[in-house]
Every structure is written in C-alpha cells, then in structure tokens.
C-alpha cells in the first residue's frame, strides 16, 4: 500500500536505497495499472463487486483511484531525500492534468478521468508544496527548473 510506505518515509524509517526501491515499485504499479501517476492508491485493486457502493469497481475512489493528494506527498518525500530527477519527472503528470482539466480534482479514474471535487484543496496544497520544494532546491543549486 502506498500510504503506509510514504508515512514510513516521512518518519525516517526507510534508507535511501529502500526509498528508491519503493519508488520503482510505485512506477511499476502505475505501468501495470495504466493509471496516470504515482497517486495510485493501491495495486492491484480489489476485484469487481468486492465492495458495494462507490468502490464496487476497480480503479474507482480508494479502490485503485489516482489521488494527487497521495502522490504529491510522495513527491515531497522524493525531494526531501534527494531524488530530484525522479520527483520532477513524476510530478509532471499531476501538473499536466491540473492544467488540462482546469482544476484540482480529488482523484482520477481509468483513462485519467477527473472525479470528485474540481476544487480539492488537498491536491492544490500538496502540489504547491512540492513545487516550492523543487524551486528551493533549484535556488540552492543555483539552477532553474
């Protein structure tokens, strides 16, 4: 699961090598799922009708949906631990979809379909913080992004 691992990184429990391994697994999950970013909540998703209601289908909401709110926090951890190139590459799909959809949606389904509120402050906040962190890194390196 993505969220507990990210929390372990935030808590300082993973080595740099372990963070790299986790990130590679997240990218592989994105590739296998066909979802747009590392905001993927889980992979593989629970099968069709495992749950009733809003999560009855795979890649919907918390059943494998793609949340910038989650992925953006992983981006922050990548930056904090020196994985700048990875963070820059992995934030792009999140920024691109905000621009394309003209909003900060809660989550995205298969095919990058935006869902939930288009004004989700959690998404806006984590992206803004990650962008600020990238700019701070660039300034410290006397570089531009």
Language-model region placement:
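Extended glycan-interaction surfaces of carbohydrate-active proteins
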Residues: 1-66, 93-145
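Solenoid-repeat scaffolds in large eukaryotic assemblies
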Residues: 19, 86-87
């Amino acid at each position: 699961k993505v969220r507990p691992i990210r929390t372990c990184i935030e808590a300082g429990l993973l080595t740099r090598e372990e963070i790299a391994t986790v990130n590679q697994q997240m990218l592989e999950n994105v590739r296998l799922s066909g979802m747009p970013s590392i905001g993927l909540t889980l992979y593989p998703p629970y099968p069709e009708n495992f749950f009733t209601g809003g999560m009855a289908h795979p890649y919907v909401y918390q059943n494998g949906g793609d949340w910038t709110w989650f992925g953006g926090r992983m981006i922050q951890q990548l930056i904090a631990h020196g994985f700048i190139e990875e963070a820059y590459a992995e934030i792009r799909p999140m920024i691109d979809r905000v621009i394309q959809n003209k909003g900060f949606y809660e989550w995205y389904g298969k095919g990058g379909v935006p869902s939930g509120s288009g004004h989700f402050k959690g998404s806006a906040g984590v992206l803004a913080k990650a962008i600020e962190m990238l700019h701070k890194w660039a300034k410290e390196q006397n570089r531009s992004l």
